Regions:
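Nucleotide donor/acceptor-binding cores
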Residues: 1, 81, 165-167
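Short gly/ser/thr-rich secondary-structure transition/capping motifs
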Residues: 12-17, 48-49, 113, 150-153
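Terminal peptide-recognition signature
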Residues: 3, 34, 152
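Cytochrome P450 core scaffold surrounding the K-helix E-X-X-R motif
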Residues: 42-47
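Conserved hydrophobic/aromatic positions in well-ordered beta-strands
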Residues: 4-7, 68, 123
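Glycine-rich beta-strand-centered segment in the early N-terminal region that forms part
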Residues: 21-38, 50-98, 129, 134-137
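NAD(P)H dinucleotide-binding glycine-rich loop of Rossmann-like/cofactor-binding domains
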Residues: 89-173
């Protein structure tokens, strides 16, 4: 498959478009044909040398596409389904995860940062991170959702501690 990778840190000139091996999904993963991957500021930080990134590296934390293959243990997703990928990985077992603050998990990572991202043709994603997208969103719109949604969600449910029934003001909605 084709992918955009970096082999060194720097400006846009370090981006290379090249052939890389197709990913092989595990039994608990799905293989996604990436149709859109949006640019997040995290991609720029990683490209410029964010600590903890192994090279070569594929950027891209926000992606959407369609499932082409499902692993043996995956029962709720199907080939052909249009999906986006929640870019956060966490253990889902520690006290922080159980409390709903997965972004504080010691095993917390972000796709496109600690692991290769979605600036590629095919991406193997854990089924628990895959979310079907409604027909009302195209792939470009869906790819703009993942990381910004998670950031907003954690601020609203964590810092602001909003609860069902409370009234909130949403600025900038359309």
């Amino acid at each position: 498959m084709k992918a955009v990778r970096i082999h060194q840190f720097g400006g846009p000139e370090v981006l290379t478009y090249e052939d890389v091996p197709d990913p092989k999904p595990r039994k608990d993963q799905v293989l996604i044909r990436v149709r859109a991957c949006s640019l997040n500021h995290l991609d720029i930080w990683v490209r410029k040398g964010l600590p903890g990134v192994n090279l070569p590296h594929i950027l891209g934390s926000d992606m959407a596409g369609e499932i082409v293959e499902v692993g043996e243990y995956v029962t709720d997703l199907k080939p052909g389904q249009r999906v986006l990928v929640a870019p956060m990985h966490f253990c889902n077992r520690c006290a922080k995860c159980v409390a709903g603050v997965q972004n504080q998990c010691r095993q917390f990572t972000v796709i496109g940062n600690a692991v290769d991202g979605g600036n590629c043709e095919l991406f193997a994603a854990a089924a628990v991170n895959v979310i079907p997208i409604p027909k009302s969103l195209d792939f470009n719109e869906a790819a703009s959702v993942p990381l910004v949604f998670v950031t907003a969600w954690h601020m609203l449910t964590g810092r602001a501690a909003i609860r069902p029934g409370q009234t909130v003001l949403v600025l900038g909605a359309n």
